[in-house]
Amino acid sequence: MEFLERTYLVNDQATKMYAFTSDRERGQKPVNKDQCPGDGPERPEAGAIYHCHNSFKATGNRSSKQVHAKWRLCAASAICFFFMVAEVVGGHVAGSLAVLTDAAHLLIDLTSFLLSLFSLWLSSRPPSKRLTFGWYRAEILGALLSVLCIWVVTGVLVYLACERLLYPDYQIQAGIMITVSGCAVAANIVLTLILHQRHLGHNHKDAQANASVRAAFVHALGDVFQSTSVLISALIIYFKPDYKMADPVCTFISSVLALASTVMILKDFSILLMEGVPKGLSYNSVKELLLTVDGVISVHNLHIWSLTVNQVILSVHVATAASQDSQSVRTGIACALSSSFDLHSLTIQIESAADQDPSCLLCEDPQD
């Protein structure tokens, strides 16, 4: 059986749909594929094929998100650099390892911000014949590299804290430590507000946060708690100078918080790199939705994965009756999916119900 590929936009969004048409459909007049049943008048067919370059939304959707992400990361980088220098100077003068630990984490954040900006630039590059999906996953690689930086620096700081516990021959200027750590708390709160992305609504189609900005936000949120713990230890040392061991103890606590902040990122990104179903989507719910479309008899070879956090891809094989208008089925599937989920790319292969083989292992549903 010979197949013909058709490409068009779904609901005028940056979503491509690829459908494979069998020989039995060749003589049928194609229907408008940009229009859901009950919508307004049909557009000119132009060969019944609509491409992404016919829509300004399609080309501008991704770039608009990139601009917002870059603005947030640039603003966060500037603030992070200024307060990092202030903490290095203040921590050195105060003799506080906890403050220097906080400065080191700001250095980690600054590095991660710069890596994220670089990865965003890479992800905006056009696809090539070797990288046909483009450079979207450069964002994920940049975020994972920043997590690795956290682990390395945290290990060094824990080692220094152990030395202070074993050899407590050091002095701390608690007054300077309070001033510097208080400013650090304020700076990290500002960073968190800049990087925070509000999500309006709770359905699957709400846009997910950019991967790089999300990783940076988690870093900044962890630093808020870390800076607060440094401030608390500074107050303890100020009122009880004999309790100066609170400084290395605070370093241990901050290190644990920093490592804990990376666990969720690693979990989500590992699933993404393993081509798992994106967070917020359910395999069963997508299949059930497809089976509700008129003309759909069965669904198999359903695959859902992501290029990056906000670039979801779906491909599926759908069986229909021989008398069913496959173009109408495709239109129904496109409308159902695009109204419920935010998809970057959609591929549908229409097959005849008579060609289905119940014993085919590839057509079986995956395990739970």
Swiss-Prot record:
Physiological role: Proton-coupled zinc ion antiporter mediating the entry of zinc into the lumen of pancreatic beta cell secretory granules, thereby regulating insulin secretion.
Compartments where found: Cytoplasmic vesicle, Secretory vesicle membrane; Cell membrane
Topology versus the membrane: Multi-pass membrane protein
UniProt family annotation: Belongs to the cation diffusion facilitator (CDF) transporter (TC 2.A.4) family. SLC30A subfamily.
Binding site for Zn(2+) 2: C52, H300, H317, E351
Stretches that traverse the bilayer: 79-99, 103-123, 140-160, 175-195, 217-237, 246-266
GO biological-process terms attached to the record: insulin processing; insulin secretion; intracellular zinc ion homeostasis; positive regulation of insulin secretion; regulation of vesicle-mediated transport; response to glucose; response to interleukin-1; response to type II interferon
Positions contributing to Zn(2+) 1 binding: H105, D109, H219, D223
Miscellaneous comment as given in the Swiss-Prot or TrEMBL entry: Each subunit of the homodimer independently transports zinc ions in a pH-dependent manner. The cytosolic pH promotes binding of zinc ions to the transporter binding site. Upon change into the organelle-facing conformation, the two histidines of the zinc-binding site get protonated at lumenal lower pH, triggering zinc release into the organelle. The transporter then moves back to the cytosolic-facing conformation where the two histidines get deprotonated at higher pH, resulting in a net antiport of 2 protons.
Residues in compartment: Cytoplasmic: 1-78, 124-139, 196-216, 267-368
Name of this chain's protein: Proton-coupled zinc antiporter SLC30A8
SUPFAM superfamilies attached to this UniProt entry: Cation efflux protein cytoplasmic domain-like, Cation efflux protein transmembrane domain-like
GO molecular function: metal ion binding; protein homodimerization activity; zinc ion transmembrane transporter activity; zinc:proton antiporter activity
Keywords (A to Z) from UniProt: Antiport, Cell membrane, Cytoplasmic vesicle, Ion transport, Membrane, Metal-binding, Transmembrane, Transmembrane helix, Transport, Zinc, Zinc transport
Keyword Iron-sulfur belongs to the record: no
Superkingdom assignment: Eukaryota
Induction: Down-regulated by IL1B and IFNG.
GO cellular component, one term: transport vesicle membrane
Organ and tissue specificity: Expressed in endocrine pancreatic islet alpha and beta cells. May be more abundant in beta cells than in alpha cells. Expressed in cubical epithelium lining thyroid follicles (at protein level). In the adrenal gland, detected in the cortex, but not in the medulla (at protein level).
Annotated residues for binding of Zn(2+) 4: H344
Catalytic activity, as annotated: Zn(2+)(in) + 2 H(+)(out) = Zn(2+)(out) + 2 H(+)(in)
Residues holding Zn(2+) 3: H51, H53, C360, C363
Lumenal, vesicle domain ranges by topology: 100-102, 161-174, 238-245
Signal sequence coordinates: none
Gene: Slc30a8
